[in-house]
């Protein structure tokens, strides 16, 4: 069994951060160690919430606590998602380095949560800079959306060709794999939901239906990152992991749309997470 330390937000009600990622990874047979960066009543897109950002010291303390019981070397991957403060970025990077000193084969997937194409950058002051200057160089895999693709690459991204250039620029900065979770308005077809995967071996594009909602569900990127790393840990190739992730997420979105719900219907769609009914294929473009 593979083990993942998932350092993300937690919501008591609904699905975002670790609530979106943990159960799907477990469904794929991965043991998840959930370490929460915030604990909120619900996700922030409701416009009101209660809760707190977890003190930065707790991240390192918890990781050292796992090491104290001689279990840290079992960690096969670290996932970081929504980060509540700039100080947490440094703590997470230190934790990644410490874990890799115990298990040099451990992977670090950085989901560089900064914002949304329609909302801009919405994280706390200093988080964006920490992700760009610290986390990206440590990451083996990174999973930006359109906003994050622009910020991480430092390049304008207004069309499909520029998106490919930005992905190549990020690869040159350290990560071995770049998964663009959603190309949004710079994809090839605005009526579709499009993703990119780039490695040293090339670049692949996948397109699936763009589901319409009265209110767009939150947590899709967290689900995507979790499924991708779980598939890789289970021995799937990059392309197999990419396709399974895209298809499973599409099925979750279909079930969520059918139930007309603002929250991702992860439990209702659990069978599709394990065995997607969608069969969209990745196409090599470079």
UniProtKB/Swiss-Prot annotation:
Pathway: Cofactor metabolism; pyridoxal 5'-phosphate salvage; pyridoxal 5'-phosphate from pyridoxal: step 1/1
Binding site for ATP: 111, 148, 181
Entry-linked NCBIfam families: PRK05756.1, pyridox_kin
Reaction(s) this enzyme catalyzes, per UniProt: pyridoxal + ATP = pyridoxal 5'-phosphate + ADP + H(+)
Keyword Membrane among UniProt keywords: no
Binding partners and assembly: Homodimer.
Top EC group: transferase
Name of the protein in question: Pyridoxal kinase PdxY
Annotated substrate binding sites: 9, 44-45, 222
HAMAP family found in the cross-reference section: PdxY
Gene3D superfamilies, A to Z: 3.40.1190.20
SUPFAM superfamilies, A to Z: Ribokinase-like
CDD domains linked: pyridoxal_pyridoxamine_kinase
Keyword Nucleotide-binding: yes
Cofactor(s) needed by this chain: Mg(2+)
Any GO MF annotation of the entry: magnesium ion binding
Tree of life domain: Bacteria
Annotated GO biological process: pyridoxal 5'-phosphate salvage
CC per GO annotation: cytosol
Cited InterPro entries: PM/HMP-P_kinase-1 (IPR013749), PyrdxlKinase (IPR004625), Pyridoxal_kinase_PdxY (IPR023685), Ribokinase-like (IPR029056)
Disulfide bonds, paired cysteine numbers: none
Keywords recorded for this protein, A-Z: ATP-binding, Kinase, Magnesium, Nucleotide-binding, Transferase
Reported function: Pyridoxal kinase involved in the salvage pathway of pyridoxal 5'-phosphate (PLP). Catalyzes the phosphorylation of pyridoxal to PLP.
């Amino acid at each position: 069994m593979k083990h993942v330390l998932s350092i993300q937000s937690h919501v008591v009600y609904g699905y975002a951060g670790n609530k979106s990622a943990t159960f799907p990874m477990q469904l794929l047979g991965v043991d998840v160690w959930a370490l929460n960066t915030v604990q909120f009543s619900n996700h922030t897109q409701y416009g009101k919430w209660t809760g707190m950002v977890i003190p930065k010291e707790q991240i390192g303390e918890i990781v050292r606590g796992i090491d104290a019981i001689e279990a840290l070397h079992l960690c096969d991957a670290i996932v970081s998602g929504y980060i509540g403060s700039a100080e947490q970025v440094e703590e997470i990077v230190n934790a990644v380095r410490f874990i890799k000193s115990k298990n040099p084969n451990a992977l670090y997937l950085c989901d560089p949560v900064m914002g949304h194409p329609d909302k801009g950058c919405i994280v706390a002051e200093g988080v964006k800079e920490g992700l760009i200057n610290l986390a990206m160089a440590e990451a083996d895999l990174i999973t930006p959306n359109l906003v994050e693709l622009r910020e991480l690459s430092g390049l304008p991204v207004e069309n499909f060709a520029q998106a490919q250039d930005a992905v190549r620029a990020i690869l040159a900065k350290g990560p071995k794999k770049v998964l663009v979770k959603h190309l949004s308005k710079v994809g090839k077809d605005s009526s579709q939901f499009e993703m990119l995967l780039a490695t040293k071996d090339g670049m692949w594009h996948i397109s699936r239906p763009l589901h319409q909602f009265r209110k767009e569900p939150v947590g899709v990127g967290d689900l995507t990152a979790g499924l991708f790393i779980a598939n890789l840990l289970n021995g799937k190739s990059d392309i197999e992991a990419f396709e399974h992730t895209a298809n499973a997420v599409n099925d979750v979105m279909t079930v969520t749309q059918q139930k007309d719900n603002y929250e991702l219907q992860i439990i209702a769609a659990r069978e599709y997470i394990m065995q997607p009914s969608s069969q969209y294929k990745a196409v090599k473009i470079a």
